[in-house]
Design a protein with these regions (language model features):
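A cytosolic small-molecule/anion-sensing beta-strand core signal
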Residues: 34-35, 63
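Short, basic and Ser/Thr-rich N-terminal targeting/leader segments
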Residues: 24-28, 83
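Residue-level signal for inorganic ion chemistry
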Residues: 13, 29, 61
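Short, basic/aromatic recognition patches
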Residues: 2-23
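Zn2+-dependent cytidine deaminase-like catalytic core
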Residues: 41-85
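Short, glycine-anchored, charge-dense loop/turn motifs used at functional sites
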Residues: 36-40
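Short beta-strand scaffold segments in enzyme catalytic cores
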Residues: 28-34
Length: 85
């Protein structure tokens, strides 16, 4: 059975995959979620849209986390999970 945070991560990643599909891209999404159920960042595959073979969903998600104004307050190594769907 999944925890609420895990379910949120999978649901958010799925929503991002659908977003990529509607944009004409590869339907893969990703979400970075804390153990207490906060979405830190999300992203979707942009390889087709940006014609960039490195624009994977997980990469877009991590880049999104790095663009947060409060990035320096985030401690991610042990307190977050990265989900992809």
């Amino acid at each position: 059975m999944l925890s609420a945070a895990e379910q949120l991560g999978l649901d958010t990643a799925y929503e991002q995959a659908v977003k990529s599909l509607y944009e004409g891209g590869i339907p893969i999404g990703s979400a970075l979620v804390t153990q207490d159920g906060r979405v830190v960042a999300k992203g979707h595959n942009l390889r087709v849209q940006c014609q960039d073979t490195t624009a994977h969903a997980e990469t877009a998600c991590i880049r999104s986390a790095g663009r947060r104004r409060d990035w320096h307050t985030l401690i991610l190594a042990r307190r977050c999970s990265l989900f992809a769907e």
